[in-house]
Amino acid sequence: MLIDYLFRLPLNILFLFSHSFSSFLLPFQLHFMQRAFVIGLIAALLAGIVGSFLMLQRLTLLSDAISHSVLPGLAIAFSFGIPLIFGALLASIISVIIINWIRTESRLKEDTAIGIVFASFFGLGILLISVIQKENKVDLNHFLFGNILGITSEDLQNTSIILAIILLFFISCYRQLKCYTFDPIMAQTIGLPINFLQSTFLILVALTIIVSMKAIGVILVLALLVTPGATGLLIGKSLEYVILTSSIIGVSCSFSGMLLSYLFNIPPGPTIVLITSLIFFILFLIINKKDSTTDSKLF
């Protein structure tokens, strides 16, 4: 009996390994998971690129306002049967215009204007979606927390177009945007189109948020925009390195988060966000420890 068991042990181990490996490969063979992986990776890549500039320009709060301001646009677009991307983009542009209008026409500071618009648009969006939910049986959670596993081929096509537009802008205007990001006064002095750069960048932020919403929803989209960029700033010594690092971190976390969500039957959006946050805190503690050790050696 013992000899027979020892003889079969390698075969049993091989069977368990092959079964586990086939379970691991199963998500990549399903069409809806393939679309989910592509959308998630594109969203993470764009968030890493755009988020790096957001962090350096200190526009984190504005991006949060834009992400929550798209809700009314989503609700209205859904009601009239038009593509959600157009409603979300229009709502985000209107929110930015209103923020700038309040800031320039009153003594209120930008953060106050952002808070007012953020709360107003988000409240209106929740109200409209709640009404639509009763009439059309739409799940509110899909808007708030994303529905990456319900992505269609049309969503994939729209996302690919957005990716091409954003990459084209950053490739063609990278030097100008870099100059404006680090020194707006010098950029204005040398005659760079400041208004064009700022307006176009905010529109691209809105497009990135719309893409990311499919992956993790309105509530958590700020984490995907900010956390990889913040992690890149911790270890990056140049803008190019920060963009590269944040993009790699975002893509890796998106891939692993979706894979874990399928294997353990947990929501993909929160899983992606938690992984990115975990990586940030681990690197933060490591770098902090190194800095404190270096400082202690100096005295």
UniProtKB/Swiss-Prot annotation:
Keyword Plastid among record annotations: yes
Transmembrane segments: 13-33, 36-56, 79-99, 112-132, 151-171, 201-221, 241-261, 267-287
Keywords: Cyanelle, Membrane, Plastid, Transmembrane, Transmembrane helix
InterPro entries, A to Z: ABC_BtuC-like, ABC_TroCD
Record GO biological process: response to zinc ion; transmembrane transport
Coiled coil regions in record: none
Compartment(s) of residence: Plastid, Cyanelle membrane
Membrane topology: Multi-pass membrane protein
Gene3D superfamilies tied to this protein: ABC transporter involved in vitamin B12 uptake, BtuC (1.10.3470.10)
Keyword Plastid applies: yes
Gene Ontology cellular component list: ATP-binding cassette (ABC) transporter complex; cyanelle membrane
Family: Belongs to the ABC-3 integral membrane protein family.
Protein name from the UniProt record: Uncharacterized membrane protein in ycf23-apcF intergenic region
Organism this protein belongs to: Cyanophora paradoxa
